[in-house]
Amino acid sequence: MSTYTPKAGDTTRTWYVIDATDVVLGRLAVEAAKLLRGKHKPTFTPNVDGGDFVIVINADKIALSGDKLNKKFAYRHSGYPGGLRKRSIGELLQKHPTRVVENAIVGMLPHNKLSRQVQKKLKVYAGPEHPHSAQQPVPFEIKQVAQ
């Protein structure tokens, strides 16, 4: 008897909604990455995209442990000499809270040919509203909440 290998059309995708209010960023990213890849399913195969859709709401209310709001930085470079720019995560959370959460989750995903396809299933919103109510997302509870 040969091993069962799921095909791309064999998987049923569920929509999950995660409320990021007072949840530590790293713990949220780990759980969201597991759902996006499909590692929680018994039919998980690393070379097939069998993961589910993930909606993250309240990204502006995410928690960071320690003093990371002021001491952790995001760097970017223009390509010109002296063009290195840095912003603290606290500044980024005020301007673009969805980018901070997206970058944390995408950083937990493998960087291979499937990564772009898996990233398209991630939807992040700063407030409590999202336009995906027609998909009937299931609430996903993260156990650890910031103190």
Curated annotation (Swiss-Prot):
Kindly indicate whether the keyword Ribonucleoprotein belongs to this entry: yes
NCBIfam families in the cross-refs: rplM_bact (TIGR01066)
Family recorded in the similarity comment: Belongs to the universal ribosomal protein uL13 family.
> Subunit structure, briefly?
Part of the 50S ribosomal subunit.
For this protein, the record's HAMAP family field holds: Ribosomal_uL13
GO molecular function annotation: mRNA binding; structural constituent of ribosome
GO biological process entries: negative regulation of translation; translation
Q: Would the keyword Glycoprotein turn up in this protein's UniProt record? A: no
Q: Name one GO cellular component term.
A: cytosolic large ribosomal subunit
Q: What is this protein called?
A: Large ribosomal subunit protein uL13
What biological function has been recorded for the protein in this entry? This protein is one of the early assembly proteins of the 50S ribosomal subunit, although it is not seen to bind rRNA by itself. It is important during the early stages of 50S assembly.
| Keywords of the record | Ribonucleoprotein, Ribosomal protein
Q: Which PANTHER family match?
A: LARGE RIBOSOMAL SUBUNIT PROTEIN UL13M, RIBOSOMAL PROTEIN L13
